[in-house]
Amino acid sequence: MKEGVVTPPDSEKDLQNVEGSLNTEEEKAEEAHIQLSKGRFVLVLVGLVLAIFLASLDFTIISTAIPKITDEFHSLQDIGWYGSAFFITTAATTAHWGRLYTFFPLKWTYLTSIFFFELGSVICGAAPSSTALIIGRAICGIGAAGLFSGSYTIIAVLVPSADRPKYSGLMGASYGLASVVGPLIGGAFTSHVSWRWCFYINLPVGGVSCLFILLFFANEPPKSRPDWRGMLRQLDMLGLVLIVGAITCFILALQWGGVSKAWDSGAVIGTLVAFVVCMILFVIEQWWLGENAMVHSVMIKRRTIWVGSMFSFLINSAFLVTFYYLPIYFQSVQGVSASTSGVRTVPFILAVTFCVVIVGQIITKTGYAFPWMIVGAAITTIGSGMIYTFDTHSPAGKWIGYQILCGIGVGVSFQVPVMLIQATTKDADVPLATATLLFIQTLGGAFGVSSAQAAFQNTLLKQLAITAPGLNPQIVLDAGASELKRVIPEQFLQGVLEAYVSGFRECLIVGIAFGGAAFLAAFGFRFTNIKRTAAAEA
């Protein structure tokens, strides 16, 4: 069994290759080598769908809870970490989980990933401080990476190739459902119970998933595995440390710069230098490891793969900047509840989800994918620019329409690089190529959210000196995002709200920049009809 990877539901080619390529039709017929009764199979499938739903929910459920979290912990400066900590560990450990599934029994390795996810959820739910919450989010990300990779790997050993797309599509639908309901569930818990239930909800549902896998999935020992030295070499622990260390240094520099420390301070410069050094060492180490690297050098040499990865990094950054900061705008500036802010972001998420499905079907029928990337990135940039115009009293028609426009742009382009890569890559390389793209795409989320947070904080502090002179900025930072109208003295409130709008707009400038860069990156692809492409890209 080879490394499993996470794929979108409309990418049938990769779903059929999640264990790696098979050389003959006879081998394909033998792929389903764990036989379960119909009842046991259904219960295992339910367990997998629940696990994917929870892992996917953690991407989105926190967005509407963040303002209340900043109220409780007085941690406005940590907003970027609440998303980035999860993205970093999910991206950095996905390849490691894929290899662990080949080294150890599939059942117990999968249950270990559930344990990590549940442990992180407990830490988040019981977190006494912002730092504890960030640590919990990072542990959740480790578990989520194992759940994504392992769920598709289990499907690969339970059903033959011809039947995998419909079952994997079911898990993909679970991912899409979680994306839509996440902000709604998060907002409802935050408004009516506590934001902590955004994480506690994982415990009973995850427990059911764990129980079904434990009782009904047959344990399968690995066919073969290297010795401990070989395993450590293939797991690339040094690469893991370098990439996590690099991104952590980058985020710390952005968090400190212009807020708690001057941009030219030793701490900020030092962390930026450490980021560059770690990235250089990571690139060298990946090249030196060759086929055992997290990011295979052969993959990056292929134009479609590195351009697709770059585009995915940029468009995902633009998407998450808007997704994470819209609830802050609604709750802090417009003063609505967390549950209402979740409802108000539905137009954006529905537009993304609907367009991903529709464009996937259109590309499958016509074979033309390249134009959708250009159109999608352009619309995303324009939509982000329109959202930039939000002010303290933007009417419903404005924030609904502009969200839909931006969501359409993201939706029509988001999955296109995956489809292009899978259509222009040899079957044997599809899992590795897709894993490379998803690794870089997820890192884009960490970079995008943290960059937007730096822009938000710096602009907020600068504008407060103009719009609310005489008010101590620390009061605003300690107030949290949704407690402004309760904490800020009335004579300063309007000025603080205007400063918040300025900070929000600066976030959108970051999103506009990422969207514009994605538009330019799209031209790096060759115009091709993927229905006529069978050979690997030259």
From Swiss-Prot:
Report the induction information.
Expression is down-regulated in the presence of TIBA or CHP, and induced in the presence of H(2)O(2), clotrimazole, or vinclozolin. Expression is regulated by the stress-responsive transcription regulator Yap1 but not the Hog1 MAP kinase.
Where, subcellularly, is it found? Cell membrane
Pfam hit, one = MFS_1
Membrane topology per the record?
Answer: Multi-pass membrane protein
Q: Where are the transmembrane segments?
A: 42-62, 78-98, 114-134, 139-159, 169-189, 197-217, 237-257, 265-285, 310-330, 343-363, 370-390, 400-420, 430-450, 507-527
Q: Which UniProt keywords apply?
A: Cell membrane, Membrane, Transmembrane, Transmembrane helix, Transport
Q: Which family does it belong to?
A: Belongs to the major facilitator superfamily.
The name of this protein is MFS-type transporter MFS54
Please give the organism: Alternaria alternata (Alternaria rot fungus)
